[in-house]
């Protein structure tokens, strides 16, 4: 039904809004996971390093986080990520070669989610997306919560992204209750 389809924002339309609602000079910041981390480090509460082959920083990271999330720094939507266990490789140089072949350039400490969120799907970090939009300017800008939703992985996959088979459930902005089946 065409009327029903008009109630959804397509990816193309979403990117149009994204470009219009965000300052152009911030796009590079949010397209690069490591730059985002550097800017918002106090809010992360986990370790994240830029991977550039063998380094003392990488060696120290592996001592603290032998199992970690390797990422392509400019990837999105659940692509370009993999949980790696350094102990499963014969050597650190072998791990480095593996990561370089896959263009991984960010290493991130794994997130341990709460027991309540883990009950939804224990293999993934299930997340709540709370997008906000500043809708007015001046001395008292109004910040509006824009369609919050819960992302849940499924079928043992460690990715919760809807584009990778995850389930997306809308959250009512007023009550905070889940209001769709997914």
Regions found by a protein language model. Name each.
Residues 1-25:
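ATP-binding N-terminal substructure of ATP-dependent carboxylate-amine bond-forming enzymes
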Residues 16-137:
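Active-site nucleotide/adenylate-binding loops and adjacent lid/helix of ATP-dependent enzymes
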Residues 121, 125-182:
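ATP-dependent carboxylate/phosphate-activation module, predominantly the ATP-grasp catalytic core
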